[in-house]
């Protein structure tokens, strides 16, 4: 499904953002400055980001393989987790490869269409992540607060429907804001002092003020961030209340272990998002915005397998079984 959406959206956006549809735009490319500094410092930064990226692909890829190959993990909880890990691979890949190329390149340019395509996929994948975190919290709520009804509610069919809603819904949220921003006149300068194509720097480069477009983007960001966040908060309020009523200490520990890992992921992801996109960003220096962006574009996908998935005993056992199967076949 992701590849179908990717192909359709790419062709549509390349047509919509092509030169023939941008008669008012004098800028044909942007310059992404990224982290600029001494060459030795940039080399260290490149090595750090590259290792982080490869480990992220390895960790999340291992989770996807474990969920797919181990029948014991063919349950709603792990199907959601496998999709989440697959999402993280594409989320970090939407920005980090271009970031790595920019560090090594003397010419740090990105085309007008390429900039807005990166903008679209980065924000759409981030929105999909918000939706998945909300659905995963709902799944834990059903499992802990309504265990007797859980098998009849969270069926395989319903789980697949939720997965499809997350993917499709995430990619349908941002076309309107992105098209509105792309139609603004950009007559120069074209330097974006950021790691990625972000709405804040793009608004600053526009030749005219666009308060209505800024308001639409701010409203979209707030709704997409706070809607799923309030859903997660509600689910875990009920979960924590139910866990505290469990008489067995071992049962409480197991429930808190699973939910605690998910809450760590939610806190890390949503904390940086709210600082970046909900609070006014005009007061934040460019360096601080880059650090915050690096946290939720690279650090969060890297840490998710460690603090959420790989701490799970069933997942670790599945990874060992999959590794053993691979070794025996070779």
UniProtKB/Swiss-Prot annotation:
InterPro entries: GPCR_Rhodpsn, GPCR_Rhodpsn_7TM, Olfact_rcpt, Olfactory_GPCR1
Intervals, Extracellular compartment: 1-43, 94-117, 179-215, 277-289
Parts of the chain that traverse the membrane: 44-64, 73-93, 118-138, 158-178, 216-235, 256-276, 290-310
Pfam families, per the entry: 7tm_4 (PF13853)
Glycosylation sites noted in the Swiss-Prot or TrEMBL record: 21
PROSITE patterns assigned: G_PROTEIN_RECEP_F1_1, G_PROTEIN_RECEP_F1_2
Main location, first listed in the record: membrane
Cystine residue pairs: 115-207
Membrane topology: Multi-pass membrane protein
GO molecular function term, any single one: olfactory receptor activity
Gene3D superfamilies, A to Z: Rhodopsin 7-helix transmembrane proteins
Keyword terms of this UniProt record: Cell membrane, Disulfide bond, G-protein coupled receptor, Glycoprotein, Membrane, Olfaction, Receptor, Sensory transduction, Transducer, Transmembrane, Transmembrane helix
Residue intervals on the Cytoplasmic side: 65-72, 139-157, 236-255, 311-330
Role, per record: Odorant receptor.
Family: Belongs to the G-protein coupled receptor 1 family.
Name this polypeptide is given: Olfactory receptor 11H6
Organism whose genome encodes this protein: Homo sapiens (Human)
């Amino acid at each position: 499904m992701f590849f179908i959406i990717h192909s359709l959206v790419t062709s549509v956006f390349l047509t919509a953002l092509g030169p023939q549809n941008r008669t008012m735009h004098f800028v044909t490319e942007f310059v992404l400055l990224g982290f600029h500094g001494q060459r030795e410092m940039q080399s260290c930064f490149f090595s750090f980001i590259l290792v982080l990226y490869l480990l992220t692909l390895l960790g999340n890829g291992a989770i996807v393989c474990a969920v797919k190959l181990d029948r014991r993990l063919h349950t709603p909880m792990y199907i959601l987790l496998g999709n989440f890990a697959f999402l993280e691979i594409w989320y970090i890949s939407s920005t980090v490869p271009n970031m790595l190329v920019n560090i090594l390149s003397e010419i740090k340019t990105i085309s007008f269409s390429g900039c807005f395509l990166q903008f679209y996929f980065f924000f759409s994948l981030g929105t999909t992540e918000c939706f998945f975190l909300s659905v995963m919290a709902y799944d834990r709520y059903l499992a802990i607060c309504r265990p007797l009804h859980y098998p009849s509610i969270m069926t395989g069919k319903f789980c697949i429907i939720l997965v499809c809603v997350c993917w499709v819904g995430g990619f349908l949220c941002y076309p309107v804001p992105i098209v509105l921003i792309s139609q603004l006149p950009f007559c120069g300068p074209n330097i974006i002092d950021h790691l990625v194509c972000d709405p804040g720097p793009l608004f600053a480069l526009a030749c005219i003020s666009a308060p209505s477009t800024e308001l639409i983007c701010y409203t979209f960001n707030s709704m997409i961030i706070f809607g799923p966040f309030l859903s997660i908060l509600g689910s875990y309020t009920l979960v924590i209340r139910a866990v505290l009523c469990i008489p067995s200490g071992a049962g409480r520990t197991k429930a808190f272990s699973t939910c605690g890992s998910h809450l760590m992921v939610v806190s890390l992801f949503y904390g940086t998002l709210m600082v970046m996109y909900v609070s006014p960003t005009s007061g934040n220096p460019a360096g601080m915005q880059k650090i915050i962006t690096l946290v939720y574009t690279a650090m969060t996908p890297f840490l998710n397998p460690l603090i959420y998935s790989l701490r799970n005993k069933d997942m670790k056992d599945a990874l060992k079984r999959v590794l053993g199967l691979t070794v025996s076949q070779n």
